[in-house]
Amino acid sequence: MTLSFAPGDSLAHRLDPRSKLLVQVAFAAVAYAYTTPRGLVVLTLVAVGCLLAADGGPRDLWSYRVAFPVLLFAPLVAGATLGAPWFRVERAATTGLASYRVLLLLVVAAAYVRSTPVRESRAALQRTVPGRPGVFLGVGVALVFRFLPLLKRDLVATREAVRTRLGAERSRRERMRLVAVGGLSRALSRADRLGTALVARCFAWNPTLPRLAFRRVDAPALALAAAMFAAAVLRVA
Amino acid sequence: MATNTESVDLVGDEAATNLARAALFAALVGAFAYVTFPNPVSPVDVTLQVLGVFLAGIFLGPVWGGASLVLYLAAGALGAPVFEGGSAGFGQLVGQTAGYLWSYPVAAAVVGAVVHRGATLRDLDSVGLPTLVGAMVLGTVVIYGFGVAGLMLVLSLGPIEAIAAGAAAFLPAEALKIAAAVGVVRSDAIAAA
C-alpha cells in the first residue's frame, strides 16, 4: 500500500494546493515551536483533522513504516547512559516528544499527498517560484512522477536478469554495480530520447498551466496556516 | 486553462537535454530507494539512493547534479514516492531524515566539483581513481555530517546517540557503494557523451 493521490471530493481535495502547502509549512513551524505534551495534544487534533479532511485513514501512514523503528528506538538511545542511573527518563521523554512530533508531520504530509494531483502540485510550484527556476522545478517534478515507475521497472528487470544468470552468487559489490549499470544506462538513453523529443515539440520556458485560484473554501485553511505561523512566531519571539 | 499571450520562449537544445537528464537522474535516485541489499553489519537493509547521489554528481557535474537532487526533493515533497521505503511528503523534509535528504544536493555538487575540478564537465576516462574515490568519500562525509546533525536537531539527541541511532549501521555499506560506483564509471556499458 503506497501513499499516493486518491481522487475524491473531500474538503482537502477542493482546496488550492498552495493553501495546503502553506498549512504544512505552518504546521511544521508550530510543531517545532511547541514540542510540549499540551502543544502536541492540540497538534494531534489538527493533524488528524487534516487527514480526515482528505478522506484519509491509518492505512495512508503505512508507507512511512520504515521511519518507525528509528522513531521508536531514538528515545531509548537518548535515555540510556553508561553508568548509574543507566536510564534517564527525562532525556528519553524529550526525545520521545520529538519523535512524536515527526509522526504528526508525516500525518499532515500524508493528507496533502492523498488530496493533490500531480498537475496541481506542479502548477503551484511553478506559480510560486518565479521565472526559469520555477519552470525547471515544475517540468522536472512532472517528469520525475512520469518516469519513476518506468525506472523502477527497469531496475526490477535488471535484478531478475542478474538472478536468472545466477548473479545472486556474486559478491554484493558486484550485484550493486550490475543493478546500477543497468538502471543508469536505461535512464541515460531515456533522457537522451526525451531531450530530443522535448526539443522537437517546441519545449518552451512559458507553457500554459492549469488555472489555480484561491476560493472561499480556502479561507479556513489559510486562516489555520496564519494562526499556526502566528503561534510559532509568538513562541520564538 | 489560463491563457498566455506572450510569444513562446523556446528552451535551447543543450538546456533541454540537461533538464531531461536531471529529471531522469532524480527519478533514478527515487527508483534506487526500492532496491534493497542486505546490510553487512545490521539487520536493516541498505538502499542504493546514496549511490544515485554519487552517480548524479559524477555524470551530470556539480551544477546539474545538484539541480537533479533538488528536483528529487521537490518531487518527493509534492508526493512522488521517492523517499526511503517508497514514502513521500513534505513531512520527510522536516522529519528525522531531514538532514540526509537536504545533504543530497550538496553532496552531489561536491562530488561533481571534485571529479570535474570545476563547473565544466571533463572526460570521465581522464579522471584518476584517487580523485573518484576521494570525491565520493567527501560526499559520504557531507551526507553523514548533515544526517547526524539533522537527527540531533530533530530528535534532540547527542552526537554519539545520533550516530548510534541513524548512522553507525549504514556507514560500512557506503564503502560497498563507492566501490560499486567506481565499477559503474569504469564500465563499458555506460557511454555518456
Protein language model features and the residues they cover:
Chain B
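Interfacial helix-loop-helix junctions of multi-pass membrane proteins
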Residues: 80-86, 150-164
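Alpha-helical transmembrane segments and their helix-entry boundary regions
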Residues: 65-69, 101, 132, 162
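Alpha-helical transmembrane segments and their cytosolic interface
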Residues: 2-23, 161-193
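Hydrophobic transmembrane alpha-helices
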Residues: 2-66
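Small-polar-interrupted transmembrane alpha-helices in polytopic inner-membrane proteins
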Residues: 25-29, 65-80, 147
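Interfacial aromatic-anchored transmembrane helix boundaries in multi-pass membrane proteins
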Residues: 34-45, 73-107
